[in-house]
């Protein structure tokens, strides 16, 4: 499976990992807020 534009593929991968990182930070923030305000 040869990609016509491997650079674009890496950019999409970085964007996906960025979204996963933001989602992880959001979940951790919710868990910590529930822990501190409970």
UniProtKB/Swiss-Prot annotation:
Keywords tagged on the record: Chloroplast, Membrane, Photosynthesis, Photosystem II, Plastid, Reaction center, Thylakoid, Transmembrane, Transmembrane helix
Family matches, as Pfam families: PsbL
Membrane topology label: Single-pass membrane protein
Subunit structure: PSII is composed of 1 copy each of membrane proteins PsbA, PsbB, PsbC, PsbD, PsbE, PsbF, PsbH, PsbI, PsbJ, PsbK, PsbL, PsbM, PsbT, PsbX, PsbY, PsbZ, Psb30/Ycf12, at least 3 peripheral proteins of the oxygen-evolving complex and a large number of cofactors. It forms dimeric complexes.
Family: Belongs to the PsbL family.
Role this protein plays: One of the components of the core complex of photosystem II (PSII). PSII is a light-driven water:plastoquinone oxidoreductase that uses light energy to abstract electrons from H(2)O, generating O(2) and a proton gradient subsequently used for ATP formation. It consists of a core antenna complex that captures photons, and an electron transfer chain that converts photonic excitation into a charge separation. This subunit is found at the monomer-monomer interface and is required for correct PSII assembly and/or dimerization.
Official protein name in the record: Photosystem II reaction center protein L
Source organism: Anthoceros angustus
Phylogenetic placement of the source organism: Eukaryota, Viridiplantae, Streptophyta, Embryophyta, Anthocerotophyta
């Amino acid at each position: 499976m040869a990609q016509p534009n491997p650079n674009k593929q890496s950019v999409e991968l970085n964007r996906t990992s960025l979204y996963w990182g933001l989602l992880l930070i959001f979940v951790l923030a919710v868990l910590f807020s529930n822990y501190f305000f409970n």
